[in-house]
């Protein structure tokens, strides 16, 4: 019998593949993990029978016997644990009645003792009444109790009730955690010791002028010792209440001074005013002297702001940083590490607050969301892989379009989003570039996707960008499907691809792994239908849901400026529904959605969850990767955008200029760097980011690229003016063309404009420009060597060396090096070269000649002359 797929069994039974896999696992068939797993007809029959009736056939029992035994053991262990728990609960219950009986016995004893001392009964009733009053009066009565303790220290009389309260305090300190019955039993024992009977006294009022008694005079309190040390330990909160009365005592001597001044000096009022002027500085000193133990500061804080928060002098902070090896000014920003070090130095606890939370509209949106009205949404699929492995060609076949043929150089250079329908269900595809310069785009694609398809060429195998794409997908914790493309080629080797990916922990299902490997041919269309079926099955397992009735939340995957339309953004809606007329905010950009269209240019009225589209109406070009949120009003959107803009502007303007002492030398050296000023313009935001990142990497110890301005859109007159103001600057355009007027303007100003549509060509040209600006490498080429055998002194000419050429040739005009005993004595140029009486251009090996060296009059017999020339080599990055 033929094998049957799990997905086919699910279709017959009317269940999802995920539910059938769970049922199979319950039966003990734990090797079934994928909807595409094929099983024999007998096991398929057994699964069918188990789903319908819950019976497990003998065929399955034979396979799953050992696993069932292990489960049985687990259940028995659980039963034993439950029995033990029941035993412990019964023991606890049996212990509780014993306590209750003992408490009852204590109560019976108390009742028997009560008729013996009727006075004790009255005192106990008084104590009960006092406890009730304590509960009613609360903190006021507590204050009265504390006053009682202070009065005892001063040996003043107190009421009998305060004495009882003191007894209660001492007893509670000794017997904390005891029950009321234990406390009353202790009070009975203390009453037995007393010889004198006490009379009933009224309850003490809260006022201070109540009846007082001498506690020390009573012999019954001889055991109680109230020392000064004990009094210090007990807090007296009543002192805090009397604090406002203290300033009146301080002012009294000032009034006496005023009266004295008035009597002595008729101008006493002036003196009083002068004294009042001297007072404020003293108050300030007191405030400054107060130590700050904890403070909350923002993430972005300057040195002087930090000093103000800590109540320190700015110079003190700067000197402390200097001692730690950091040179700063008062306007420099402090990073988190520096803040922590300073906090430890000054002994202050610091709580760092992120100011960005004030305008974090995404956080506000997520907090207000509830799991209501959830429905299934379209899956978002990202196609990733190495350059030229056929990602766009595969998407072309799926969409029945020809995108790849229209792309410059046959490579994708921006992110695109497309919608496809399969079996009546929508699927959103994101196509990402494979070139190494577009790392940020691939990371952005992986972060907003549900499933990643990694395309690998069967004839080429795993490449660096393939590995990078897999790492991005793993970092985003997204399911991975491998599409082995170019299976129509003769040298296709899918097994090689599988082994290479297995080394990266991407194991195919056939080898016991969890990743689907689908062989496809984007050219002929083989295997594409299977790929789409697997994508939909994977989406069913993920159970992707969203609330279409909520405010829209979307991710901007690409943005640009289009003539006649303004800022345009390609988005994928993640939750809610975006409609025409909605007010939105995305980073520093905001506005009303004026129009929407799909990937083929058809107008749309709304975009649902998981769907993609292009929107028009933002105030400016939003950053790619930014989150777009629909808000209630234009005012709210403008407020969010303006706060973000101001925050980013302050951050940009106040970039820290601090440098460590070790880096100071490197900074001074950097001032001597040559720089190529560049104005960069591109068609979309993503391409602009990629080119900027690539250009910034083109640098060494001598030269670098300085991007003085960059932006999305065409080249404008202001760009030409800026380029003309900067020396040796050029304008680079990517996928854009300047108008005739701009070309004329650039020609008049002497500005060079270069435009490209392939990123390789742009980077190669910039490398060549940088190489031309770099200092050439000068190398020496050895020409020949001669031995001096005779030195002739010629009047007015100086010394002439009679030489024998031992190696190579000696040339006129070449550089000469005079060597004596292996040491260079002199370097210069050949002034004259003669053979006999004739001037010659060069003398070859084995011939004699006369050589004159410019400015050298110290030649000796036995010295050697070395002839060489300097060669310049152009440097390239």
Swiss-Prot record:
Keywords per UniProt: Cytoplasm, GTP-binding, Initiation factor, Nucleotide-binding, Protein biosynthesis
Sequence ranges of Polar residues compositional bias: 245-265
Binding residues for GTP: 385-392, 431-435, 485-488
Ranges for region G3: 431-434
PROSITE patterns given in the database record: G_TR_2 (PS51722), IF2 (PS01176)
Region (G4): 485-488
Domain of life: Bacteria
Region (G1): 385-392
Pfam families linked to this entry: EF-G_D2 (PF22042), GTP_EFTU (PF00009), GTP_EFTU_D2 (PF03144), IF-2 (PF11987), IF2_N (PF04760)
Biased composition (Basic residues): 192-201
Localization terms from the record: Cytoplasm
Region (Disordered), start-end ranges: 66-127, 187-208, 241-290
Function field: One of the essential components for the initiation of protein synthesis. Protects formylmethionyl-tRNA from spontaneous hydrolysis and promotes its binding to the 30S ribosomal subunits. Also involved in the hydrolysis of GTP during the formation of the 70S ribosomal complex.
Family the entry assigns: Belongs to the TRAFAC class translation factor GTPase superfamily. Classic translation factor GTPase family. IF-2 subfamily.
Protein name: Translation initiation factor IF-2
Native organism: Campylobacter lari (strain RM2100 / D67 / ATCC BAA-1060)
